[in-house]
Amino acid sequence: MGVPELSRAKMITLTLCFFLVFFIASDTLILSTASVSILNDLGGQQHYSLIFSIRGITIAVTCMLCGRLIDRMGRRNMLLFGLLIGLLSNVLGATAPNMLVLVVSRALYGLGYGFINAAVMIMINELFGKKSGYGYLITLIGYGVGNVGVPLLAGWLVENYTWRWGFWLLVASAVVCIALLVSSCPNYTMLQESNSKKLDVKGIIYSVLAISGLVGVLSFGGKSFAWLSLTTLVLVLFTIVMFVLFIRTEKNIDQNIAIFPVSMMRSKVLMGCAIGQFCMSVNSTCLYVYIPYYMQQEMGTTATQAGAATSIISFMTTVFGAILLVAMVKAQRHSVFGLITVVGEAIALVLISIFISPTLSVCLLYTSDAA
């Protein structure tokens, strides 16, 4: 199975996708690298995890909506909407006077992230079909460039200027993406898309409430209220009830408009993808959110050193990911490589939990030698 022919339209779309994934990949790394400086400036250390949790809620909700909204808005309009939200959220983050405003800005960014990420994945599938792995390779490189270069730059900005410049960097990236999108990418919809104007409103509401309850327990439990308290019990029961109502709604509604078609749970492939994505998300959160924070807060490193360590990890992740992706596309054995990925993620999490300090010390040693 050869490499697909790249027409001018595909090249423009792939270039746009490269910049888009660079934009959405940079946010987490800028926040985590500048985390200690942000907390020292704005306070609210106990709410550090909420910055990422609230974004996760809005990403999850937006991704569930995107399949329906993109049918109505078109590809370019969906991307433009997401970029404008991302632009606004980063301006808000750059000028945030307190932690509350920063949390709100990350919630907004999650909305933009969800629109952008879903639209990029849909466009690549439509352009490349069975050879979409080559399109994903381009997006992986975009993630890699963002993950390798941004932590170093963010650390340098924090030490020499202010953490707020990291957000202005994201604003500049959004402007570049918007200019490329408006000038080069036509808006289009697919002929086979449904003309139904119905939305799964109940499913959206129940899913938001269920996810919010879960995040509330995990973010504030043991901090704002005790784990074994009435507040925790009420939140847990609320989350369970909302989740049950969500599943019942999705089972009874027309599966063509459901945001979570229950029939998908019968697919072993989709369930395997969900498990793999969960493992990858846990691993990525540990690597890119908490390791830079841990290095600065507990190990006493500088923001630049934490950024350098993150860049080393990101470089290795990108290289091995690209090799596996190319091998998977050529072999067309997706399930085998998916299993390899899940096992690798699990092993990585165990190694991080056991050897976190020695691992980081090795990264710092390389950083010191390079300096």
What function would you assign to each model-found segment?
Residues 63-202:
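Helix-loop-helix hairpins in multi-pass membrane proteins, especially solute transporters
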Residues 10, 14-23, 31-33, 89, ...:
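12-transmembrane solute porter fold
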Residues 38-39, 69-70, 156-161, 295-296, ...:
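Interfacial helix-cap and linker-helix signal at transmembrane-aqueous boundaries
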Residues 53-67, 311-320:
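Central cavity-lining transmembrane alpha-helices of secondary-active solute carriers
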